[in-house]
Amino acid sequence: MDAFTENLNKLAELAIRVGLNLEEGQEIVATAPIEAVDFVRLLAEKAYENGASLFTVLYGDNLIARKRLALVPEAHLDRAPAWLYEGMAKAFHEGAARLAVSGNDPKALEGLPPERVGRAQQAQSRAYRPTLSAITEFVTNWTIVPFAHPGWAKAVFPGLPEEEAVQRLWQAIFQATRVDQEDPVAAWEAHNRVLHAKVAFLNEKRFHALHFQGPGTDLTVGLAEGHLWQGGATPTKKGRLCNPNLPTEEVFTAPHRERVEGVVRASRPLALSGQLVEGLWARFEGGVAVEVGAEKGEEVLKKLLDTDEGARRLGEVALVPADNPIAKTGLVFFDTLFDENAASHIAFGQAYAENLEGRPSGEEFRRRGGNESMVHVDWMIGSEEVDVDGLLEDGTRVPLMRRGRWVI
């Protein structure tokens, strides 16, 4: 077995054993781009070797998506397969694990009318709501694992031939997910201990807010009442640990939906609905992004923020050190799974119930500051030029990050 095949097998094994922490006899519902079919077959093999009872996969095809967006009447863009997502949510509530294979061409829908892309995305977000709720409430174990899609590889390495670009991207994936180490499972156990130590410190401090300061950024993010920090291996509602993101470098919590003030500028591009949003900035008042703009992709961004009332509020704030393995590559990945783990970030939209004590829902969730929305979109605001302080209720400042690096 050559080194590449060995690492690919390690990644698939890691996704099942560490990412999902698969339970004996558990079903898996997987989603993936059609280009990842060979990798998905390997994942299915590892799943069955580790006790899965059924592996069901749903593929997405960007070429079909482009045809639809280009050809169907405008009114048809309001259609999305709600029946499919209701079925997925039902499977998760009944105990199936969720496995998402990420990795898409970030420019797959480039050149299409932004208003049509945005309209279809709104419909998709509405239909997807039951599935998103099941995921954010951690009703089951879930994970996201990357695949080196050729279109993604060309976006990251535009100057290389496609085959070489794909090889380079796989190398970056193996490094970021620690599968290039002799014992990836042990490496992840050690990594989780580091993340859990940060989580314990932040939860003990009970900060009232966080303050981000850097070029174009002066942002205060109030934290929800009874907020909890999470990071690394996370328990489901039933208490089973899983690692939701492979890779992950973040610790994150829930902002208070009404206590975000100031201005903030993105430090990395955002891949959104098959288009790139660059130079993103926002100004918040009373928790709402009252002004937003971007140098590129502004229309599709604003369409997303019009999805519902909660789309202009924050559902997540995450701290990520600027000297972690992903950031050290010096690459912009044009992929949220990677870029969010290279920089501190915030997210428009839905908050995670796991980030509030007792995992409340409904009115109690809202009363404590949890945000509700049909969308959840992370965007990166941290860098080596950004400092972060924790603010106690009495106004005391506690330095957390200086020049993007932990000081705790």
Swiss-Prot record:
The keyword Transferase does not apply. Its cofactor is Co(2+); Zn(2+); Mg(2+). Coiled coil: none annotated. The keyword Disulfide bond does not apply. One of its GO terms (molecular function) is metal ion binding. It comes from the Bacteria. Keywords: Aminopeptidase, Cobalt, Hydrolase, Metal-binding, Metalloprotease, Protease, Zinc. Binds 2 divalent metal cations per subunit. Can use cobalt, zinc, and possibly also magnesium ions. A divalent metal cation 2 binds at residues 316, 340, 376, 378. Homodimer. Metal-dependent exopeptidase. PANTHER family: AMINOPEPTIDASE, AMINOPEPTIDASE AMPS. This is Aminopeptidase T. It comes from Thermus aquaticus.
